[in-house]
Amino acid sequence: MTPSPFFKKLKTHTAAAVCAATIGLFSSTSAMAADMSNGANNFYQSQQVTIQKVTFKNQYNMDIVGNLVIPKNLNKKTKASAIVIGHPMGAVKEQSSMLYAQKLAEQGFVTLAIDQSFWGESTGQPRNVVAPDIYAEAFSAAVDYLGTQSFIDPNNIGVLGICGSGSFVISAAKIDPRLKAIATVSMYDMGAANRNGLRHSQTLEQRKQIIAEAAAQRYVEFKGGETKYTSGTTHELTANTHPIQREFYDFYRTPRGEYTPKGSSRELTTHPTLTSNVKFLNFYPFNDIETISPRPMLFITGDQAHSKEFSEEAYKLAGQPKELYYVKGAGHVDLYDRVDLI
């Protein structure tokens, strides 16, 4: 994708503002051959970068694990610009984040693709827990790490959030001015999506039923009962499978993007715990979004994306400078990895 003039100009001022201007896709090793139809390239492997596994603490003394991606031609005698990259909600860094991380590193940025707390290789028990404040903290912890590296310019660190991480990076940026520019791709406001559904399709009564189910399940689990999981991506398609679930299935349940991190199982991937998922109902990332200004914000969405309402709402509320960029012909999941569109 060709960068807009707005972000060509920003490139001279800050590293992360341009992070989504060249929407790229990432890769990693997988036991399955990657499905490359429609330009999908989730498991891309760059020959122009080095990848180093790093671990650092967040404020809660939890381990955050990430892949530090460094251009092979980087001059470590100078201070490089850096970008922190967050994966889609329920995913791990090996899904979409590492493609972006490598493509941006090929442009000269040092990038850091992290696993969220409770997911992937990062610590946190129980697994698959929803904790929006801790999710936001992961991005500030990543700045702690990057900003103390001798070859990184601590005043030129930005952040890119994909899908649900788009809302988490906004939450982080509101209280961490070290994030100098903020970009989102196919953003989901995980608070609004869980409270109201897409396009306000969920009623208050339905929301109350979800809350009641989670409350009842807490008793079950407190007494030693089995942990229950919710939402996420279906494991099989039927004639009645919703088109949006089919879109996610094509990425998460096929060789195109399927990845099971060590210590998890295919059955649990993408699924948060039911009792913790209601934490999203108290998550309002767009409140006070205008206070991020004058740091620049970029919202990228497909013009066919079922989720575009969230990027549009964030853009409407954000202060200047800001840009809303539509990728023609792209759906929500297309921007995870379909390089012919992004």
Give residue spans per PLM region.
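Conserved alpha/beta-hydrolase
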Residues: 103-123
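Catalytic histidine-centered segment of alpha/beta-hydrolase-like enzymes
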Residues: 330-341
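Alpha/beta-hydrolase fold nucleophile elbow
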Residues: 151-163
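Alpha/beta-hydrolase active-site loop
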Residues: 129-150
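Alpha/beta-hydrolase-fold enzymes
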Residues: 170-254
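The serine-hydrolase catalytic nucleophile loop
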Residues: 90-102, 116
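N-terminal cap/lid segment of alpha/beta-hydrolase-fold proteins
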Residues: 35-78
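Short beta-strand/loop motif that positions the catalytic acidic residue
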Residues: 292-293, 299-301
